Amino acid sequence: MVSILSNIGMMVVTFKRPSLFTSLRRRSANNIIITKHSHPISTTRRSGNYKPTMWDFQFIQSLHNPYEGDKYMKRLNKLKKEVKKMMMTVEGSHDEELEKLELIDNLERLGVSYHFKDEIMQIMRSINININIAPPDSLYTTALKFRLLRQHGFHISQDILNDFKDENGNLKQSICKDTKDILNSSKDEHDNLKQSTCNNTKGLLKLYEASFLSIENESFLRNTTKSTLAHLMRYVDQNRCGEEDNMIVELVVHALELPRHWMVPRLETRWYISIYERMSNANPLLLELAKLDFNIVQATHQQDLRILSRWWKNTGLAEKLPFSRDILVENMFWAVGALFEPQHSYFRRLITKVIVFISIIDDIYDVYGTLDELELFTLAIQRWDTKAMEQLPDYMKVCYLALINIINEVAYEVLKNHDINVLPYLTKSWADLCKSYLQEAKWYHNGYKPNLEEYMDNARISIGVPMVLVHSLFLVTNQITKEALDSLTNYPDIIRWSATIFRLNDDLGTSSDELKRGDVSKSIQCYMNEKGASEEEAIEHIEFLIQETWEAMNTAQSKNSPLSETFIEVAKNITKASHFMYLHSDVKSSISKILFEPIIISNVAFALK
């Protein structure tokens, strides 16, 4: 908040702004005492009162994962060969399309599909070629087919779902029954829901999941999201099926918490393994492969983390900048969410270092720096020259030089591997980020309230996603084209859509209590001020914008792009991570399950003998 202390000619400025990777929410305001001429008389600085990390250097270095051993890799490779044989058998079958679809769906949910990319694409191409001559399918099969084809980049029309539309272009009421119909006409002799009704719910669940892959101007799919959601919520409320169908309830509840298309892949895998092993039709070969692969990949992530932990300790920045958060593990979790596969360690280690500096600089702008210092730091970032350090206070000099070293390291690696000097693109992204930070500081300092459009134009930069994705582009792309470089001038659509969703999720996760303590206005408050809307109406509008932006993101993915498939996957996964990190309360528990807690494999000892 800003108040004028006219008797001494001073202003007390409180500024607080969340940015990328601030999942540990700030809890108090920042008081900076400056004169009306913006020259410090006295400065009351504070730490953020952040709690010490629960995953310190000793803990990380002491991590020991037995699944790093060669014997487990041998078993994994043997299981992979067995699964490939199974896939070849399934691929050769012309009659069991559903079996093929469910196999691919399970491989993806179990987190092992990356081992079988070629085999999966061969099956999907075959399904796509025969799509117009295949006989009519059930809702379950058709919805699953539609989602998987779109997910794998095939241009499949929503018209494949025409058999399930009524004359008005809506989902048939016979498919999506109301509560009264279910209660009165769908019970069996044991007063439970008929199996046909439970099967229908499986189909509606698949349709609900598929609807989130809609692109622009697909009103049927957008309306389908609402109608299937209503049915699935009623189904959960009733929960009257037998023991087998309690599994369906779990699947529905999980989907309603966060749509499949918006879920972080690694979190989905950890959850689904625990579900799959309780299914009566679970394939023991797939189950063992999934568990073993999860633990081996986790061992790779722990190795990444040990290396990063030593790097972080050697920088000495934790001691030099005690006001900043020590959240190395949380920062690396974003990198794991972006690309978890073991072959991407190089990407995870470098991008985690970049993210670490986002959180440090975020704390400088948010917690510690005066407005004068922030202006000097922003200018220094724009110059990207060690001589620019001369005007900075000592604590900023340390951060500034360390940042230059890390980003120059990234640029050197790209130059070495691709013969392209990307430093101008990297430094521009940092300059854009710091300018957006400073803009928000000035808005608050001057008491200015932007409208929603003006706020978002700046906020989609200040969230940090464009900067992270620019660095990611150069770290995951094998062939960097001139067209891809040119697209970075104003940030391509995929980056802007990802940043927009990320920012809106961050804003939804900002509590009203935080705003009272001095947080700047977010998109919700901007919309309320601009439209005279209630908070509930504003939240509903922001949620609508998120879904609309996902449609734009899906549309952008469906078009030819100069950007690599791996980069687009990173952009999507970063976006998915924002849904979880900002809107769920059990983040630390989830991080532990992904990075530190292996899955128990009861039969692995026997298998390895």
UniProtKB/Swiss-Prot annotation:
Q: What is this protein called?
A: (R)-linalool synthase TPS5, chloroplastic
Essential cofactor(s):
Mg(2+); Mn(2+)
Gene assigned in the entry = TPS5
Which Gene3D superfamilies does this UniProt record tie to the protein?
Answer: Farnesyl Diphosphate Synthase, Terpene synthase, N-terminal domain
Annotated Mg(2+) 2 binding sites: 362, 366
Q: Which UniProt keywords apply?
A: Chloroplast, Lyase, Magnesium, Manganese, Metal-binding, Plastid, Transit peptide
Binding positions for Mg(2+) 3 per the UniProt entry:
506, 510, 514
Q: Where does Mg(2+) 1 bind?
A: 362, 366
Residues forming the motif DDXXD motif are: 362-366
Q: What is known of its domains?
A: The Asp-Asp-Xaa-Xaa-Asp/Glu (DDXXD/E) motif is important for the catalytic activity, presumably through binding to Mg(2+).
Q: What is its EC number?
A: 4.2.3.26
A GO term, aspect molecular function: terpene synthase activity
Broadest EC class? lyase
Q: Which GO terms describe its biological process?
A: diterpenoid biosynthetic process
The pathway entry for this protein reads as: Secondary metabolite biosynthesis; terpenoid biosynthesis
Task: Name the family the entry cites.
Answer: Belongs to the terpene synthase family. Tpsb subfamily.
